[in-house]
Regions:
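Acyl-group handoff/entry surfaces in thioester-processing enzymes
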Residues: 1-73, 88-177
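Short, charged/polar, Gly/Pro-enriched secondary-structure boundary elements
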Residues: 74-82
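Hydrophobic pocket-lining residues within nucleotide cofactor-binding pockets
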Residues: 85
Length: 179
């Protein structure tokens, strides 16, 4: 178990101040206008949860002062959901729905704080939606994680170079806490 870093505390304080985890959600749609092998994409998302330790962080129940601890689970065996939004007529209509998903909260203790959903979108776009608690990752890290996931996909689909190993989350966390 580890305490929160300074950056995580900032987001946690917002959650406490506003009484909702909604103020600490971050969501991204990553899609391409091309056919995707959703079986392979699912495999790559599952691999990404192994490679990106932040996706496996859980938070304990708050203590009497509202503070939480964080810990890393070794595996996340959850299935990856799939939504076919291609019949919605336009990307704008699909975006409206996904904007609603972005406001959903992760309520509870010792629960996953990251969720991937594979998507079939209007106008021939396909990809995934990722929704996370911002205490797990910053915006730059989210871009790196999405890039890594697509590199895994292109490695298995097209034989491109295998992506470099990512920084180990627990090692980086310990360094941040030592500052």
């Amino acid at each position: 178990y580890y305490p929160l870093t300074a950056a995580q505390k900032m987001h946690h304080n917002w959650i406490m101040d506003y009484g909702t985890q909604q103020v600490s959600g971050v969501s991204v749609v990553a899609s391409v206008q091309a056919e995707l092998d959703f079986g392979l994409l699912k495999k790559c998302i599952q691999m990404e949860t192994e490679r990106s330790g932040c996706t496996r962080i859980r938070f304990t129940k708050p203590d009497k002062d509202g503070n939480v601890q964080q810990y890393l689970v070794k595996q996340d065996p959850r299935d990856i959901g799939f939504k076919d939004l291609s019949g919605m007529g336009s990307l704008a209509k699909a975006d409206e729905l996904m904007q609603q998903w972005a406001y959903e909260t992760f309520d509870g203790d010792d629960i996953p704080m990251c969720e991937f959903t594979m998507l079939k979108l209007p106008e021939g776009y396909n990809g995934f939606f990722v929704h996370m608690d911002h205490r797990l990752i910053d915006s730059c890290g989210l871009v790196v994680m999405i890039g890594d996931l697509f590199q895994l996909y292109t490695y298995y689909k097209y034989g491109t170079a295998y992506p470099q190993e990512l920084a180990d989350f627990e090692t980086v966390l310990k360094k941040d806490l030592a500052k």
